[in-house]
């Protein structure tokens, strides 16, 4: 039985990331780079070498239905590799378990060894709490970057791992495409997507309250030039790996030509992003001008909040007084919002979706 990992350069190669040995790993790239294939192989190899099972994790239970899971593991490059190295024909899902299988004489799948489990975060707190999952070491979390997240998702994911692995060691591979930079997972890992560049593996050490250190690794994969039939915005996001953004209104006048009425800030608890908002007056109209506002110590934020006095040293925010808050809401609802760029506008609008007064 021979199972070898991919060592070429045509597709994604995660050997450098795996070698670091971090328990928390995130991989971000353009679509169809081969990263999912690489880490599924990594988990299968670990099973055959060390008998360690893996967990396939998705955000929503729709993606963990057997037909969708079977489709995920049906990649021809994977099944040929598995068949050649082990004699098994693939991986199938049955009652939230993952099993190796062979095709029998009747043409049907014959279930073999259990190799892992499937989990969905949106049902995790109710479904998996009192159950036992022995032997799980690896976790593959697909599409961990999304346009929206479930409530307190990072904590839900941590609790799931705690339920499954208990106090045993584990290794997480979070796999994502370049959809949105406002990702709570990477923020919690100490990775700032505003200050990283493709083509490099970043490492960050987190310090727990008891003094223990946790190593996190982030592989921001360099986009590869490929021939494709996509064009326009799709070409930038699907082929070139650029961030998935929408067209938003930009500042159409010089900021110094407008009258500044006041400045405030918006801080998102879940996404851990901050924005500076200027209320300006230009040619008989008021506008909101929004642009990113970065500061280092943001983990203490406990609410989505508008504030005009962010006291970062004392870690305290003062809410906007009602009149100013109402003015911002009115300008938002009337569509008089301008942004520094499309990426800022896309991310700010996503943050606003969770802020009830603006929905």
Give the location of each predicted region:
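Phosphate/NTP-binding elements of NTP-utilizing enzymes
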Residues: 2-359
């Amino acid at each position: 039985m021979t199972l070898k990992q991919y060592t070429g350069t045509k597709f994604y190669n995660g050997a450098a990331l795996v070698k670091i040995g971090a328990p928390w790993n995130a991989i971000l790239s353009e679509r169809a780079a081969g990263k999912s294939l690489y880490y599924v192989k990594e988990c299968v190899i670990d099973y055959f070498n060390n008998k360690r099972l893996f967990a396939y994790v998705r955000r929503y239970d729709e993606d963990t239905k057997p037909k969708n899971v079977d489709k995920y593991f049906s990649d021809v490059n994977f099944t040929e590799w598995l068949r050649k190295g082990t004699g098994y024909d693939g991986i199938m899902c049955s009652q939230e378990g993952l099993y190796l299988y062979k095709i029998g004489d009747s043409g049907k799948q014959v279930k073999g060894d259990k190799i892992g489990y499937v989990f969905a975060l949106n049902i995790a707190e109710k479904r998996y709490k009192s159950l036992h999952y022995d032997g799980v070491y690896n976790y593959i979390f697909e599409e961990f970057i999304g346009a929206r997240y479930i409530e307190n998702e990072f904590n839900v994911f941590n609790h799931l791992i705690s339920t499954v692995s208990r106090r045993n060691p584990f290794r997480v591979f979070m796999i994502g495409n370049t959809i949105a930079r406002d990702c709570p997972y990477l923020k919690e890992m100490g990775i700032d997507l505003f200050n990283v560049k493709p083509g490099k593996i970043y490492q960050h050490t987190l310090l727990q309250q008891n003094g223990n250190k946790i190593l996190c690794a982030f592989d921001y994969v360099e986009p590869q030039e490929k021939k494709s039939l996509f064009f326009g915005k799709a070409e930038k996001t699907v082929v070139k790996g650029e961030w998935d953004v929408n067209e938003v209104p930009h500042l159409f006048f010089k900021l110094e030509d407008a009258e500044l009425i006041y400045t405030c800030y918006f801080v998102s608890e879940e996404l851990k992003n901050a924005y500076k908002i200027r209320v300006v007056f230009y040619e008989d109209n008021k506008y909101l001008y929004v642009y990113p506002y970065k500061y280092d110590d943001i983990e203490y934020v406990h609410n989505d909040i508008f504030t005009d006095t962010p006291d970062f040293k004392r870690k305290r925010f003062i809410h906007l007084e009602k009149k100013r808050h109402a003015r911002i809401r009115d300008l938002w609802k009337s569509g008089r919002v301008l942004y520094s760029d499309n990426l800022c506008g896309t991310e700010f609008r996503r943050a606003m979706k969770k802020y009830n007064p603006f929905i």
